[in-house]
Amino acid sequence: MHSSIPPVPREPGLLRVASVNVNGIRAAYRKNMADWLAERDVDILCLQEVRAPDAIVRELLDESQWNILHAEAAAKGRAGVLVATRRTPNSAGEVLKDQPVATRSTIGEEYFDDSGRWVEADYVLPNGQTLTVVSAYVHSGEVGTQKQEDKYRFLERMLVRMPELAEHSDHVLIVGDLNVG
């Protein structure tokens, strides 16, 4: 995995978050994602289109280094999103409380529950406030198809969920591949 964007120097006291559509985590690791990730020194990692069973995800990311929350798609080889927080201190010697205080892998509509397109994790920040992190994958659509209707339905559900999250948490970060451009 290569990026033309160089790593940014770390600012003490600030969280570093990376969100990446990996288009298959096994392929990303074959393209040196582990090195890319080490260079970025992130505190929170969000991935989309993971496309792998949970056991493989945990092996590749190394559970001794990361607390992993993975929403796997029921359809083999499709979608899949995750939020992971590092278990070890970052280069500034800081660590976010690695275990989320609550997690959810649904956007609130049963139709999407096993789609592997939405996962939420609540973390307590050092100041005691709550941060909710969402990793989302909205599939691309094709005009006039059921796939497009499903996409619109998912986006509509996001519009309902966002104010709910704002009520629930002090801070909300929604990242992912939203396919809305």
Give residue spans per PLM region.
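N-terminal, active-site-proximal structural segment of metallo-dependent hydrolase catalytic domains
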Residues: M1-E63, N67-L69, A73-V81
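Short amphipathic alpha-helices and their capping/turn segments at secondary-structure boundaries
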Residues: L37-A38, W118-G128, R157-D170
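A structural signal for short, well-ordered beta-strand segments and their strand-loop junctions
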Residues: C46, V133-S135, H171-G176
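Conserved CoA-thioester-binding segment of acyl-CoA-metabolizing enzymes
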Residues: K31-A34, E149-L159
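Short, flexible loop segments at the rims of nucleotide/cofactor-binding pockets, characterized by
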Residues: V20-A27, G108-Y111, E149-R153
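Metal-dependent phosphoesterases centered on the DNase I-like endonuclease/exonuclease/phosphatase
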Residues: S64-N67, F154-G181
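Structured beta-strand-rich core segments of catalytic domains in phosphoester-bond hydrolases
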Residues: R51, I56-G141
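Metal-dependent phosphoester/phosphodiester hydrolase catalytic core
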Residues: S140-E149
